[in-house]
Structure formats: structure tokens, C-alpha cells
A protein has these predicted regions:
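Conserved loop-alpha-helix segment in the C-terminal half of the alpha/beta-hydrolase fold
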Residues: 7, 169-208, 299, 461-492, ...
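N-terminal cap/lid segment of alpha/beta-hydrolase-fold proteins
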Residues: 239-264
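Helix-rich cap/lid subdomain of alpha/beta-hydrolase
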Residues: 83-136, 142-151, 375-428, 434-443
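Active-site loop/oxyanion-hole signature of alpha/beta-hydrolase fold enzymes
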Residues: 16-59, 207, 212, 270, ...
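Conserved serine/cysteine hydrolase catalytic core
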Residues: 141-187, 433-479
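Catalytic active-site module of serine/aspartate enzymes centered on a nucleophile-bearing elbow/loop
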Residues: 192-246, 484-514
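Conserved HGGG/HGGXW glycine-rich cap/lid loop of the alpha/beta-hydrolase fold
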Residues: 1-27, 267-317
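Conserved hydrolase catalytic core segment
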Residues: 52-91, 344-383
């Protein structure tokens, strides 16, 4: 949500927006936490980056985290900007605790309509269905942790802790659902003021719709006092080690690297050097999913090898290309990615569209790619291509949010055997980040000459063929593979990497062992 705002503020200072633990791409805690815990984790981020004096901005729940950081680190935090500073009455807290409980998942997808309406009713001026979609996508991305942040916010004694803050505070108060509650903060601050923002211009989404204006308000306040020279000390960056499960075996780390179209996000498991007895495995996801699809199987296969799962450009957290591209272009990016890792040999694993990327990658790196494993092989007839192109069209966002419900119902028939609705929702929620590139993956897949390109591959190929929407198409791979086989998997389907992880991993492990 802060992307455009960060660009403005980052013109003359370091600007960082960290995902709270359990939200965005930050690793979740094992159980619900309180605002004090969120603030402590953010303090650890500052320490690990070697950051000295800072200014802190928070919005809604983030305002409470900002106040707590200021109290925990009074000599480090210089000034605070709060976008809304809600001080609740006890009756309001009881009401909010009831209203902001999780919405149960519904097989018909109606929970998405409820969530959409919750955000739509408080949209700010200039916020259209596209922006509301982004807000919804971020909200449901947290899954069952959706309500953890709200419950922590309602448990926090915000008024009392606000009184303790001795740093200067600017409260930006748009005319939104917290405007009345924010006015109560006026008499609680030692050194602060509330700036009421015009209701016809500012509200939810103002960081996206009016980033220049918001940045101007913030910059004027922060720059009113001289800064210290130790805001960031590059020599200290990364020197402070924080105890973290990120060092534990089987931990899936998230990182970014540069690509030809911006930042490329990827997940990886990197076991200790002594345990790396097998070639690295690179995984390519289906469209419009992300590398998140491989997390559970990465933990099993990553015990004796490096396993990486990059998000294809335009999906997950990877930045999109400027226009629709082809499978060959995706493979070029993944070629760069592998070469940057310095791997001499790799095995690759592609899921649906990712199977085509894996195939094309062999054509780019025939000496490095030793084995190709495919989760389905999309080999279409001309009639099937015409049908798929008609059904997998770009999504049009509607003000009532029914496009999400319709898409949920579109994929629902392919719910895999024994796949819990929670797993289906997690996979589906990844697709909700539909920006302009949503349909580009399908477009590229339907344009790719899979049979022709696969027939030219002389590396060993294993096609895992579960009973899903590509079952019949994948059988055709047996007629074009030079080396390898199609492995039919009756009783398996979508979600099998989560519901039958060990069985799928065992088949892959045996195939790539030579």
C-alpha cells in the first residue's frame, strides 16, 4: 500500500515499509500476538539493518505499533506520523471485536463478497474497484491470521500509551471509519496535533490516490526539525544477529533479486553445506499462482538439496513486464536467475504453465538442466486451445465484487481429493492479486508450442499426471518425450503437493536421483 508514497519519500531519505509478522510476506508467529510483540519485531528489523535514529509512520493498527515502538525505543524514534489514532470507548471495542472476527470460508465463495463489501463501504475518494481489489487481496492473503491484527489492536491500551509518548506527533485524520475515534486523541498527546484532511479528497486508499499530497504533509512535519547523521550507518548494516527460526532446517526464506523487469521474488531452502548431496531443484509455478504453491514440498525435498521457487514476473511478489510476453521471455528471466546463483547443474520442476517454462528453460540451458519434472503437461488440440482462450479471459473488476465469487466458483470443480477448503482458499487467494498481468500467464501458455518444444528435449522428463483439468492433455506427452515417462496418478488432484506431500516428493526424488 505504501509503494507510491515510498517513491516520493525515498527521494531524499531511506524509506522502508516492513510487513508486520503474519501479514504480507512476513513469516507468521505460531499463535496470535499483541501490539507489543509486533513493535518488538519491528525494532529487531531496525537492529538487523543497522539503523540508528528514525522517524516512524503508522496507519490504523500500524499507528498503535508506531506508538509502542516510540515508547520501547524513546532515544531512537525521533518523530511520529499517525494516519488515524483511534481511541475507543469500551462499548465500541466490544462492537468492533464482534464485527472484525474472521469470515468463515464458504464453498460457494460468498465469503469473498462479504469481505469485498467490508472494504468497499469505507473506500476513499478516487478508490475504484481495481484498488479495492488490491486491498482485498492483501487482507485475505493472511488467511486465518486475518483477525489477529484486529484483535491485537482492540487489546492495546492505545490512549494510555499515547500519553506516554514524548516525541512530536502528527496525526493525519481523513474522514473515514476512525475519524470520530481519532479526535479523542487530541487531548492525550504531550506534543502533537491532529490535521483534519478534506473528506472529498482523502480517505482509505489515499497513499495510492494522492501520494504526492500525503508525502508533502509528512515531509513538512518531519523536516521541521534537524535530523541526526546516524539515520543509517552502512558499516553497521546486518551486523546485529537476531535469534530467528529462519536459521532452522527446513525454513523457507523469502528474498528478492534484480531481473530485467524489476525485482524478482523467490523462496528458497538452503540446507547446511554438508547435507547438500543432490543437485539444486528450481520450481516454476502455475498461472496465476506464485512460488507459494511449493512451500510444503520444498520442506521435504530441501533436506538434501537447495530448492528455489521464484515468482514468475507479474505474479506473486515479482514485478511485471511492461506488456504481455511469451513463455520464452519468462524462461529468459529464469535463465538469468539460475546463472546468477552460480549453479553448474540443476533439476527443474514445473507446474502447469511452469511446465512450459521448464521445457523452454532446457532450450536455453541444455547443459545445466539435467532433469525435468512436470506437474501436468499442457499439450492442447486446436479446439481445446480455442475453448481455453475463451474461458481464461482477463478479469473485469465490478463494483459489487462478484467477479471474485465467480472466479472462485470457476476453479471450485477442480478441488482436489481430500483438499480442505482452507488449502483451496490459500491457493485461490494467491490469484486475487490480479493486476494487469493476471491473464498474461494463460495467454503465454496457450501460445506456446508445447508438443513441438518438448519433443526436442533430450534430458529425462517425468510428467506427473494427476486427475485434474489437464489429465487428458498430459497423456499426450507420452508420444513426444524422448527420454522419460508419464506417471499417471489416479486419486490425486489439485492440492496434492499439500495433501500428499511425501508421496509426491518421493516420486520426484527417485526420478532426479541419477
Amino acid at each position: 500500500m505504501y509503494g507510491h508514497f515510498l517513491q516520493r519519500m525515498g527521494a531524499d531519505r531511506v524509506a522502508i515499509a516492513a510487513d508486520t509478522i503474519g501479514f504480507g510476506e512476513s513469516t507468521p508467529p505460531p499463535e496470535p500476538k499483541e501490539i507489543e510483540d509486533f513493535a518488538s519485531c519491528m525494532g529487531e528489523v531496525l537492529d538487523s539493518l543497522g539503523i540508528g535514529t528514525v522517524d516512524v509512520l503508522g496507519m490504523h493498527t500500524g499507528s498503535e505499533i508506531a506508538v509502542e515502538i516510540a515508547n520501547q525505543r524513546p532515544d531512537q524514534v525521533r518523530r511520529l506520523v499517525l494516519v488515524s489514532a483511534p481511541v475507543f470507548t469500551e462499548d465500541e471495542l466490544e462492537t468492533f471485536r464482534t464485527e472484525y472476527k474472521g469470515v468463515p470460508l464458504a464453498p460457494d465463495g460468498s465469503h469473498l463478497k462479504i469481505r469485498w463489501d467490508m472494504h468497499w463501504q469505507w473506500r476513499g475518494p478516487g478508490v475504484d474497484a481495481n484498488l479495492n481489489q488490491l486491498t482485498l487481496a492483501e487482507a485475505v492473503h493472511s488467511g486465518e491470521r486475518y483477525e489477529w491484527g484486529h484483535q491485537a489492536a482492540f487489546n492495546y491500551p492505545f490512549g494510555a500509551r499515547l500519553r506516554d509518548v514524548r516525541q512530536p506527533i502528527l496525526v493525519l485524520s481523513p474522514e473515514d471509519d476512525l475519524a470520530v475515534k481519532t479526535k479523542r486523541a487530541d487531548g492525550l498527546m504531550q506534543d502533537g496535533r491532529i490535521m483534519d484532511l478534506p473528506k472529498d479528497t482523502f480517505g482509505h486508499g489515499m497513499f495510492e490516490t494522492h501520494p504526492d499530497a500525503v508525502a508533502a504533509f509528512v515531509r513538512e512535519f518531519l523536516d521541521a526539525a534537524p535530523t541526526q547523521d546516524d539515520a543509517v550507518n552502512p558499516d553497521d548494516a546486518g551486523k546485529k544477529t537476531i535469534a530467528s527460526p529462519a536459521t532452522a532446517p527446513g525454513f523457507v526464506r523469502r528474498e528478492f533479486t534484480d531481473s530485467r523487469w524489476g525485482q524478482l521474488h523467490y523462496r528458497s531452502i538452503q540446507p547446511p553445506e554438508a547435507d547438500r548431496t543432490q543437485r539444486p531443484l528450481i520450481c516454476f509455478h502455475a498461472s496465476p499462482r506464485s512460488g507459494n504453491a511449493f512451500i510444503n514440498i520444498m520442506k521435504v525435498l530441501g533436506r538434501d538439496r537447495i530448492v528455489m521457487a521464484p515468482d514468475t514476473p507479474g505474479f506473486g511478489e515479482s514485478e511485471p513486464p511492461p506488456a504481455p510476453v511469451e513463455i520464452s521471455d519468462f524462461a529468459d528471466v529464469m535463465t538469468d536467475f539460475i546463472m546468477k546463483q552460480g549453479f553448474e547443474e540443476v533439476d527443474v520442476f514445473g507446474f502447469h504453465t511452469g511446465a512450459e517454462v521448464a521445457t523452454e528453460l532446457w532450450h536455453k540451458l541444455p547443459k545445466q538442466v539435467r532433469h525435468i519434472v512436470m506437474y501436468s503437461a499442457p499439450i492442447f488440440s486446436e479446439d481445446e486451445l480455442a475453448d481455453f482462450r475463451e474461458r481464461y479471459t482477463p478479469v473485469t473488476f465490478t463494483d459489487d465484487g462478484m467477479h471474485n465469487v465467480e472466479r472462485w466458483q470457476f476453479f471450485w470443480p477442480w478441488l482436489g481429493p481430500d483438499q480442505p477448503i482452507e488449502n483451496y482458499a490459500g491457493a485461490f487467494n494467491e490469484t486475487l492479486r490480479w493486476g494487469p498481468a493476471y491473464s498474461w500467464g494463460h495467454r503465454a501458455a496457450f501460445n506456446y508450442a508445447m508438443a513441438k518444444r518438448l519433443k526436442q528435449v533430450n534430458a529425462p522428463v517425468l510428467v506427473l499426471n494427476p486427475e485434474d483439468d489437464l489429465y487428458e492433455q498430459s497423456k499426450r506427452a507420452a508420444d513426444v518425450i524422448q527420454k522419460g515417462r508419464v506417471h499417471d496418478m489416479p486419486g490425486f488432484g489439485h492440492g496434492m503437493m499439500d495433501t500428499r506431500t511425501d508421496e509426491v516428493a518421493a516420486v520426484i526424488r527417485d526420478f532426479v536421483a541419477d
